[in-house]
Amino acid sequence: MPLSYQHFRKLLLLDDGTEAGPLEEELPRLADADLNRRVAEDLNLGNLNVSIPWTHKVGNFTGLYSSTVPIFNPEWQTPSFPNIHLQEDIINRCQQFVGPLTVNEKRRLKLIMPARFYPTHTKYLPLDKGIKPYYPDQVVNHYFQTRHYLHTLWKAGILYKRETTRSASFCGSPYSWEQELQHGRLVIKTSQRHGDESFCSQPSGILSRSSVGPCIRSQLKQSRLGLQPHQGPLASSQPGRSGSIRARVHPSTRRYFGVEPSGSGHIDHSVNNSSSCLHQSAVRKAAYSHLSTSKRQSSSGHAVEFHCLPPNSAGSQSQGSVSSCWWLQFRNSKPCSEYCLSHLVNLREDWGPCDEHGEHHIRIPRTPARVTGGVFLVDKNPHNTAESRLVVDFSQFSRGITRVSWPKFAVPNLQSLTNLLSSNLSWLSLDVSAAFYHIPLHPAAMPHLLIGSSGLSRYVARLSSNSRINNNQYGTMQNLHDSCSRQLYVSLMLLYKTYGWKLHLYSHPIVLGFRKIPMGVGLSPFLLAQFTSAICSVVRRAFPHCLAFSYMDDVVLGAKSVQHREALYTAVTNFLLSLGIHLNPNKTKRWGYSLNFMGYIIGSWGTLPQDHIVQKIKHCFRKLPVNRPIDWKVCQRIVGLLGFAAPFTQCGYPALMPLYACIQAKQAFTFSPTYKAFLSKQYMNLYPVARQRPGLCQVFADATPTGWGLAIGHQRMRGTFVAPLPIHTAELLAACFARSRSGAKLIGTDNSVVLSRKYTSFPWLLGCAANWILRGTSFVYVPSALNPADDPSRGRLGLYRPLLRLPFQPTTGRTSLYAVSPSVPSHLPVRVHFASPLHVAWRPP
C-alpha cells in the first residue's frame, strides 16, 4: 500500500507521540474541520493579512509592480519563410492515399480550406498605431526591422497588400477562391469612346504581372479632384500604343492607390506602370519631354499626378512627381544641418520603387486605410535570440464590444496522453515549419485583420516632440526638415548598410491583410489543432500498425522498430510534402523509446515531467523564502510550475490548495518552514503516472452519511462513522478503505466526485491523504441500484447482490484518436516502401 500512515502524520505534525489507530478510525478524523483549522494555524496557512511588506520576486518569478524591460537586438535576423502553399485539393489527395475519409476528417479539412473569420464588430485604428513603440530607445531600428519582416511575409505569400479600397495584391500561387471570376475571366470595359474592346482578359482570371498595371489602373475612379487621366499601354497584347488615354471610369470610391491616412494632406502613391521610381537624372528629363502629364490641385491641398509612358521608354522607371514622396523631396532641398537627411538621400542615384505590387491582384471587400492591430518584434524564443519573431496584437477580438468567443477544442490530459503514448514504440517528432502560415484565410476576412504602418515620416513626427503634424501643410518644404535629427540620421546611415535602397520602400505607408491565419487570434490554435489532428488521423489509418499523434504543430510518429520507424518517416514525409506541408528536416528529433512531448517524457513505464522542469522546481525551492509574505502574483507563477508536476507527487493538487486560496483572495502568502519542507519533500521524489490497463472490476465501495460498505469479491464489509459526514466525504473515505483493504487498482463507485479524481474541494488534510492512498487507482461508475456495496453501507450484510461484470476500458479522452472509418480497400498496396526515393538522414550506428 502506497501510504505509510505514520509517515503522513509525522510529515504533517499530527503525531503527538500516540500510536496511530487503524485507518478506518484515523482517516475520518482528517475530515474534521477543527483539526484542519489547527493544522492551518500551525503551518501558518490561513494568516493572509500581514503587515510586513510583500516580496515581489522569488528566483526568476516576478510579481506585481515589476516591469520587465524588453531587450531590442539590432542584430536580429528576419527568419526566412518557405513558399508555403497547402494544396487546395487536400481532401482528394488524402483519399488517394488512404481511401474514403471519415466524416470527421472531411469536416476538419473543410474548416481550413479556406479558414474564415468574420467578427461582428471591428475597431479600426489609425496607421500610426500599426507598429507599436515597444522599444522607445530604438524607435527607428525597430520600425525598419518590423517593416522588413512584414515585407518578407508579403513576399512569402503570407500577407495581402492593400492596393486600393477594393483590391489587394499578393505573391505566390493563387487559390480558386482568390480569383476574380466573371464568366470564367476577368473583364474590364473601357468607355464607349474607345469602342467596346474588353482588354486584359485572361482565361484563368488571374492577372499576370505584366498586365497588372493597366487592368487595375483602368479602374481608377473619379475622385473629388475631378477626372484623372489614365495611364499606360492598354495591355500586353497591344505593345505599340502610347500616349495618354483618358478613360471615363465609374465614379464610386474616392481614393485609389495610397494608404496615406486621409487627414495627412497628400496622397503619395504614384500610379505607375512598372511600379518603380525614376532615376533622378538626365534620363528622367529626356524621358519626360514627350509625356502628357496633368496636374490638378484640390482645395484641400492634395496634389495627385499621373503619367503615361510607352512601355519600352527609357523612363519606364516612372513615378509621380518627386514632390509627392517624402523621401525623395530631400533630394531637391537644401541641407538644414550636417545631420540632414538630404545627405543620405543624395548618396544614391536610384532609390528603387516607391511601391511594389504583387504577382496577382484580387478583389476584396471594402478595406479602409487603417489597421485593426499593432505589431512589434521580440526574440524568436528564449534559446534563439539571434532571430526575431513578429508579435501581432489583435487583442481587440478578445475584449470589449469587439470580443469574439473562440471555439473550444480538446487538449489531451495527462492520463489520456499516457494511455495513448506510453508503449514500447520507437519515436520521432517532426517539425512543421511556420505551421500557422499553412492555413489559408478567405480574402473576405482581410478587412478585419489589418496591420501596417503610416510611413517613416509620420512615425518619426509622432514620436518626436519638436514637430507637429499639421494636416494642411504636411509635406511642404518648411516642415520637411522637422524630422531631421542627429539620432535619426545616425540610425538611418547604419540601416542603409543593411537595407540599401529598401530604406526608401520601407519609409512609405502600407496596409497589409493576412492571407494565412495569424498567430494573435484565438481562432488560429483551434484551426491548427483541427488541421493536424485530421492529418494524423489519415496517417494512422494508412499505417494501422504505427502511431501518429499531434498537438498543434508538434507531430510524433511511433513504430515497433527503428528500421520500421525510418521507413514510416520516409513515407509520411513524402505524403506531407505532397499535401504542401513544409517540414524542417534539420529539426526532426529521434527519441528512441522514450518520447519527449508537451513537456513530458513518455516511456513504456509511464510519464514524468521533462528534466528542465524538474530543475526549475528545484531552483524554485532553493530560492523560496520562509516567513516572508510573497505577493499573490508570484504565488500564481509558483503554482503554475508546481501544478504541472503535481500529478507526479504523492499528495497531488490538494497539497497546493492553501496557495490557491491565497491567490483567489489576492493576498500575500507566507511559507512556514514546515509547509515548505512538506512541499519540497513532495516534489523531490516524483513518481511516474502509469498507463491504465483494461480489466474487470471486482471491488465496490459505497457509503451513506453515517456508514460505509465494501464488496471485495464475495466478501462484504461494513462500518459506521463516529459522526455523520457530508455524502461526498463519506464516499471518498469508502473508496480509500476499499483500496487499502484490497489493494485493487480498479474500484467501482456511484459517486461522481470520487470518479473525477479531483480531491481539491475536500478538507485539506483529507484531500492530501486520499490522493496519496488512491494514486494510480482507476474508477468505474456503477449505478447505485446495481452496486453490491449498497446494502452493506446501509448496515444490511445478509442480502447478497450478485457481483457485476463491469469491464473497464482506459479512456483516451476527447483526443478522437481513431475516427471510426470505412474499411480501407484491400487492393491498396502496403504503404511502407523500404526502397525510398527520399534519402533518410539516419545512418545505422
Swiss-Prot record:
Family note: Belongs to the hepadnaviridae P protein family.
The name this protein goes by in its record: Protein P
Biological role: Multifunctional enzyme that converts the viral RNA genome into dsDNA in viral cytoplasmic capsids. This enzyme displays a DNA polymerase activity that can copy either DNA or RNA templates, and a ribonuclease H (RNase H) activity that cleaves the RNA strand of RNA-DNA heteroduplexes in a partially processive 3'- to 5'-endonucleasic mode. Neo-synthesized pregenomic RNA (pgRNA) are encapsidated together with the P protein, and reverse-transcribed inside the nucleocapsid.
Cell membrane listed as a keyword: no
Chain intervals for the UniProt region annotation (Disordered): 226-245
Tagged with keyword Nuclease: yes
Pfam annotation, one family: RVT_1
Binding-site positions, Mg(2+): D431, D553, D554
Region described as Terminal protein domain (TP): 1-179
GO biological-process terms attached to the record: DNA replication; symbiont-mediated suppression of host innate immune response
Gene3D superfamilies per record: 3.30.70.270
Encoding gene (name): P
Stored InterPro entries: DNA/RNA_pol_sf, DNApol_viral_C, DNApol_viral_N, HBV_DPOL, Rev_trsase/Diguanyl_cyclase, RT_dom, Viral_Replic_Matur_Polypro
Entry's free-text remark on domains: Terminal protein domain (TP) is hepadnavirus-specific. Spacer domain is highly variable and separates the TP and RT domains. Polymerase/reverse-transcriptase domain (RT) and ribonuclease H domain (RH) are similar to retrovirus reverse transcriptase/RNase H.
